[in-house]
Regions:
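Alpha-helical segment of the N-proximal tetratricopeptide repeat
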Residues: 48-84, 91-98, 165-172
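Register position in tetratricopeptide repeats
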Residues: 64, 98, 132, 168, ...
């Protein structure tokens, strides 16, 4: 009985041992299979990530090289490997817009905007797309959202760049007053930067605000008196505004900063004209004798111009000349006063100057633009640089 019991116990132990070994083997096999599966899965995932990066890189390069259609194909492929990658979605939306698929790009960016309404880049792209779609108000709204949105990197610089872009857009659609407001805000937020100040001045000039533009050019020249672009631009604006003396100074200094062969012909002509106008202008700054000499010279030029123009219109219109009124002024005794008489009566000097300027303006309207010194007198008369 004892022998049988021992054999039964031994058989049970062998059975338990065999089952344990089998179970342990199954566990080991399962562990190995799990490890292999995890390895394959991770390898597959890594491979997909690598492929996604490779295709997105191709898309980025295609965008940089100006091939948006190629970029679209590459980026769609990248998204097939990494469907939730936000950076790839942004690039694809950008590529769609660059390729001219405006509606598709707009809708894509709108979907991204729903997730990140404060993203500066997304709002900027939506602003540009809205502008292309001629949705003016939406474009302006998105530009403002981009300005006040979040940016990676130097947000201050990016916001300023967006505000300048908005100003350019406003100028392009004829909304100059709003453009001026944006530019002045950009200027107020700008720590002194020459390139930015010059850009602001150029844009203000384009917007039709020459005084504001000139203030920025002067601001640059206060810090950098020999800044060539500012000297030339300010000189042109002073010339166009009729301040020929200041124009001559600025243009002369600007030209001095340039190599002789680099000076534009228009600048040289403007400089020469400004010098000539300053030399012939009946300014109060010169001596009384010199002023009267200039008045007499200008009167001779204006009278010759009147006589030529009057003969031309009289031949065409007969006795009813449109210059009849100015002609009666020339026929008056005080229109031929000599040097001594003018020196004794400052009022007559000013009256003669007014006759000269009125003659140049009226003859230009009736007989066309004059040439030579008369053309310079016309510029002088329009600017009213003569001082009381």
């Amino acid at each position: 009985m004892t022998v049988e019991t021992d054999e039964l116990s031994s058989a049970k132990r062998r059975l338990i041992f065999r089952d344990a070994v089998t179970f342990l083997g199954l566990i080991l096999v399962t562990a190995v299979l799990l490890a292999i599966t995890l390895f394959l899965f991770r390898s597959f995932t890594a491979h997909r990530a690598e492929l996604a990066q490779r295709w997105s890189g191709r898309g980025q390069n295609a965008l940089n090289q100006g091939h948006p259609e190629e970029a679209i194909v590459a980026l769609r492929t990248a998204l097939s490997y990494a469907p939730d990658e936000n950076s790839y979605e942004l690039l694809l939306a950008q590529a769609l817009g660059d390729a001219g698929h405006l509606d598709e790009s707009y809708n894509y960016f709108l979907g991204l905007w729903d997730a990140e309404p404060g993203n500066g880049f997304i709002n900027l792209r939506l602003a540009r797309l809205a502008a292309k779609k001629r949705d003016t108000q939406a474009a302006i709204n998105y530009y403002h959202a981009a300005i006040y949105g979040t940016w990676e990197g130097d947000g201050t610089v990016r916001r300023r760049e967006v505000r300048l872009e908005l100003a350019r857009y406003l100028i392009s659609i004829g909304n100059s007053s709003s453009a001026r407001s944006e530019l002045l805000i950009a200027g107020g937020n700008n720590p002194y930067d020459v390139s930015v100040e010059l850009t602001l001045a150029d844009l203000l000039q384009q917007a039709g605000y020459p005084k504001d533009a000139l203030n920025y050019y002067r601001k640059v020249l206060t810090q950098e008196p020999k800044n060539e672009p500012a000297l030339l631009a300010a000189g042109r604006m002073e010339y166009e505004g009729g301040n020929f003396e200041e124009a001559h100074r600025l243009l002369e200094e600007g030209v001095a900063e340039m190599h002789e062969g680099d000076v534009p012909a228009g600048i040289n002509m403007m400089l020469a004209n400004a010098a000539h106008i300053v030399a012939m202008a009946p300014s109060e700054k010169v001596s009384p004798d010199e002023r009267v000499e200039r008045i007499l010279h200008a009167r001779s030029l204006a009278k010759t111009r009147f006589d030529e123009c009057n003969a031309q219109v009289s031949a065409a219109n007969g006795p009813t000349s449109p210059l009849q009124s100015i002609g009666s002024r020339w026929a008056a005794e005080d229109a031929s006063l000599g040097r001594k008489a003018l020196l004794k009566d400052h009022t007559e000097e000013d009256a003669t100057v007014k006759l000269i300027f009125d003659t140049e303006v009226q003859t230009s309207q009736i007989c066309g633009a004059p040439t030579g010194d008369n053309a310079l007198l016309l510029l002088l008369s329009k600017s009213q640089t003569v001082e009381p």
